[in-house]
């Protein structure tokens, strides 16, 4: 009976379908198999032109994909036979990570379902999963003029938001939000499709400020009506594009940007047992009058969504500020070192610096130095998401625990060691001369001048092993004479700093 009701209402569920569906058969067993799955089959006949049929099939595929996103255990075998030619496509996932949102929904969190990125394999800068933030549920109000049944319960909206792809480390490019995708779901996780694909925007969503105060984040939203059905992604019901600001264009921004995913789940809650047909009636009410219901409940809806988006974008905003500060600091450090290198009058000092980073000239030295600083700071300030930290922990311990637990310190150390090994191997090739210099210096006996009391300003080096090396180098520089004291002292100190930089790039042994 439920399946026949589904057939009767499928035209309203999929408004993009122009075909008139005719029930021909219902086959399959309704008893569960060994895996606990209840299979069934529905076959329909349609009579329409091939081009129209192709569009209708795309609409159905999109509907099935949206169901899979919140019901990953369901599998659909979608077959189309046209003029004797049969084509079959299977919709379903196996062993993919999900996140229970607490409202009975298990949401797929693999980013590949939501965005298509040519360079998505760059795991250095982005996590392969989204990390949704669940908002607080609010009750929706039904306008008095909306004709329909009397509901013995409440309509509850629960938002969830996430950035896709999710940044996990500091990269050389600032992350910017380039688009917003909104996905609508009704009771039992059934997709809500509000209108035809020719006019996919309702009055409520045409006003870009109805959901979130985007000006708070200096974002200007424009409704995006160009939704391509012929893509292997779950398509949003509502989409906005973000206009690039002059500030974004003046900085090194990720050209593709991030997408803010916003999931709106509308469910029905009642103090009495809810019948299947009652749920279907609520679903029909939502597909017909959701726009009016959202307008009537505008204040509570905007408050809940704003709170959820604030939590997501505040993290994004703080990360962007930290990245800008880090980039500015790196530029200052590189410029300071370059001023010492180019200002030195000793060719041996400049040659040693270039050899340390295997650079042919000062321009290449600047480029490599900036790259080295950037890579090292990425490893030092690594912000790994809990899923990938746990994944590496599982490989290390060979256990079978959940993937959403919080990381421990040992996991973070494991990641830092793993990420620094490749850079360590590359940089060790430039260090033999440095080690040779240290051996020569340590083999020398201290001269009387080295043992003599130093001026107060000469003891400004920190009281650490590095500081002692600075003082020893300074003492040795005093012996040959006072004429060239300034330049030679500067050369020795900065040569030692370059040496220290080479050592810093190599991972230190564990405690």
From Swiss-Prot:
An annotated GO cellular component: chromosome
GO terms under biological process: meiotic DNA double-strand break formation; reciprocal meiotic recombination
Compositional bias (Basic and acidic residues): 466-475
Tissue-level expression: Detected in lung, spleen,colon and in skeletal muscle. Expressed in the ovaries, Fallopian tubes and uterus.
Localization in the cell: Chromosome
InterPro entries: TopoVIB-like
Amino acid composition bias (Polar residues), ranges on this chain: 408-422
Disease: Hydatidiform mole, recurrent, 4: A disorder characterized by excessive trophoblast development that produces a growing mass of tissue inside the uterus at the beginning of a pregnancy. It leads to abnormal pregnancies with no embryo, and cystic degeneration of the chorionic villi.
Protein name: Type 2 DNA topoisomerase 6 subunit B-like
């Amino acid at each position: 009976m439920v399946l026949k009701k589904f057939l009767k209402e499928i035209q309203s569920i999929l408004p993009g379908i122009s075909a008139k569906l005719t029930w021909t058969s219902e086959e399959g067993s309704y008893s569960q198999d060994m895996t606990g799955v209840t299979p069934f089959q529905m076959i329909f006949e349609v009579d329409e032109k091939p081009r129209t049929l192709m569009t209708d099939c795309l609409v159905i595929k999109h509907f099935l994909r949206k169901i899979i996103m919140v019901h990953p255990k369901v599998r659909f075998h979608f077959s189309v036979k046209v003029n004797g030619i049969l084509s079959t496509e299977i919709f379903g996932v196996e062993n993919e990570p999900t996140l229970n949102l607490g409202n009975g929904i298990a949401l797929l969190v693999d980013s590949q379902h939501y965005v298509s990125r040519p360079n998505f394999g760059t795991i250095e800068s982005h996590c392969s999963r989204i990390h949704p933030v669940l908002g607080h549920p609010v009750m929706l109000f039904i306008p008095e003029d909306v004709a329909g049944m009397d509901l013995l319960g409440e309509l509850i909206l629960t938002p969830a938001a996430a950035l896709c792809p999710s940044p996990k480390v500091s990269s050389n490019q600032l992350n910017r939000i380039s688009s917003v995708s909104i996905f609508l779901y009704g009771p039992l996780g059934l997709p809500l499709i509000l209108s035809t694909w020719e006019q996919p925007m309702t009055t409520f969503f045409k006003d870009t400020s109805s959901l979130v105060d985007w000006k708070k984040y200096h974002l200007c939203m424009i409704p995006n009506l160009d939704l391509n059905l012929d893509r292997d992604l779950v398509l949003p019901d509502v989409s906005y594009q973000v206009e690039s600001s002059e500030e974004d264009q003046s900085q090194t921004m990720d050209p593709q940007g991030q997408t803010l995913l916003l999931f709106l789940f509308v469910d029905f809650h009642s103090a009495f047992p809810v019948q299947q047909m009652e749920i279907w009636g609520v679903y029909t009410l939502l597909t017909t009058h959701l726009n009016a219901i959202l307008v009537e409940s505008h204040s509570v809806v905007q408050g809940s969504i704003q709170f959820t988006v604030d939590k997501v974008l505040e993290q994004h905003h703080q990360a962007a500020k930290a990245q800008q500060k880090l980039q500015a600091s790196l530029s200052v450090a590189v410029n300071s070192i370059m001023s010492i290198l180019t200002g030195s009058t000793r060719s041996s000092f400049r040659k040693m610096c270039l050899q340390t980073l295997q650079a042919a000239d000062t321009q290449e030295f600047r480029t490599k130095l900036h790259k080295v600083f950037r890579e090292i700071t990425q490893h030092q300030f690594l912000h790994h998401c809990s899923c990938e930290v746990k994944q590496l922990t599982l490989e290390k311990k060979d256990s079978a625990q959940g993937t959403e637990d919080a990381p421990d310190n040992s996991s973070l150390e494991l990641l830092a060691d793993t990420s620094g090994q490749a850079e360590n191997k590359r940089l060790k090739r430039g260090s033999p001369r440095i080690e040779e210099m240290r051996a020569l210096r340590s083999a020398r006996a201290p001269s009387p001048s080295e043992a003599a009391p130093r001026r107060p300003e000469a003891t400004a080096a920190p009281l650490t092993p590095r500081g002692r090396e600075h003082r020893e180098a300074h003492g040795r520089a005093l012996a040959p004479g006072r004429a060239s004291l300034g330049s030679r002292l500067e050369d020795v100190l900065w040569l030692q700093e370059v040496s220290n930089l080479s050592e810093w790039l190599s991972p230190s042994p564990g405690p």
